[in-house]
């Protein structure tokens, strides 16, 4: 039996200094990003918050060891109407394995990338997604659109990316319950002064998306609740996820970010 290692990483602002419609030709963090990605040892990887990665030279500099890369913009109405400077945002995919098919996943007001690899008896499909930042209701709609797409066939599938949602509280222990209470109090305080963190934190504590994916047969690969996202400087939330259906997995890991992002990369091994 062989294995295929899949990585997922939200690279803050794509590695650039800020969100902008006009970006410099060279990614200022490209060397640091490339070192972190190389250290993961992933056969395939999904990159979210990939601002500017529609430029093939940017992808090549950050992903030098991969023979195939692709990019899709998010097409997010919420993103482009409220923050037009973020229109370069998207999801990138890279692999060293033979690609059988690749399609854009229409999530209603965002897009993902579905890539089927020529691996195993039935192939292996990797759905790279980056769900909405603030609204759990929008994330729920996007998750349902994702399932509608994936349920067309029974290809073994991995969903991986920054889902901007957390594990359901009933699946966690007392420590997470206490932390959740603190976050809810912080959300109320931020909302009282009309700070955008209020909406963001309130949405994170709704925790509805993963149960929807679980009900459709997708298993969360995480073996613990180690956080992946820094908010704003401490690792507090596990919002980057890898879920599988129709295949076995092992060796879920959270890796150091190397100072290249406000998210830690994750990897899992898929048995073929």
Residue ranges and their predicted role:
Residues 47, 71, 244:
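Short beta-strand and adjacent tight-turn residues that come in two discontinuous sequence segments
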Residues 48-65, 78-88, 170-176, 235:
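Metal-dependent catalytic neighborhoods of phosphoester/phosphodiester hydrolases
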Residues 64-67, 98:
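Short small/polar-residue motifs
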Residues 1-39, 44, 84-272:
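Active-site regions of metal-assisted phosphoester/phosphodiester hydrolases
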Residues 67-80, 103-104:
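A short acidic/basic microdomain associated with nuclease active sites
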């Amino acid at each position: 039996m062989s294995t295929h290692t899949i990585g997922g990483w939200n690279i803050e602002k794509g590695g650039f200094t800020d969100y902008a419609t006009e970006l410099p030709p060279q990614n200022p963090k490209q060397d640091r990003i490339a070192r972190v990605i190389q250290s993961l040892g992933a056969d395939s990887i999904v990159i979210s918050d990939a601002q500017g990665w529609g430029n093939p030279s940017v992808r090549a500099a950050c992903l030098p060891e991969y023979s195939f890369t692709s990019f899709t913009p998010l097409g997010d109405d919420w993103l482009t109407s409220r923050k037009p400077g973020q229109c370069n945002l998207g999801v990138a995919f890279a692999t060293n394995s033979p690609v059988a098919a690749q399609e854009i996943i229409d999530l209603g007001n965002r897009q993902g990338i579905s890539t089927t690899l020529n691996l195993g008896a039935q192939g292996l499909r990797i759905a790279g997604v980056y769900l909405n930042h603030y609204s759990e209701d929008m994330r729920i709609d996007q998750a349902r659109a994702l399932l509608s797409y994936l349920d067309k066939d029974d290809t073994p599938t991995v969903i991986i990316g920054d889902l901007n949602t957390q594990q359901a509280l009933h699946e966690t222990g007392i420590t997470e319950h206490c932390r959740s209470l603190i976050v809810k109090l912080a959300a109320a305080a931020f909302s009282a002064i009309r700070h955008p963190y209020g909406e963001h934190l309130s949405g994170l504590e709704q925790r509805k998306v993963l149960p929807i994916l679980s009900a459709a047969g997708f298993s969360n690969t995480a073996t613990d609740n180690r956080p992946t996202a820094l908010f704003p400087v401490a690792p507090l939330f596990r919002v980057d996820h890898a879920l599988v259906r129709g295949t076995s997995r092992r060796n879920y890991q959270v890796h150091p970010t190397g100072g290249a992002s406000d998210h830690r990369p994750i990897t899992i091994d898929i048995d073929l």
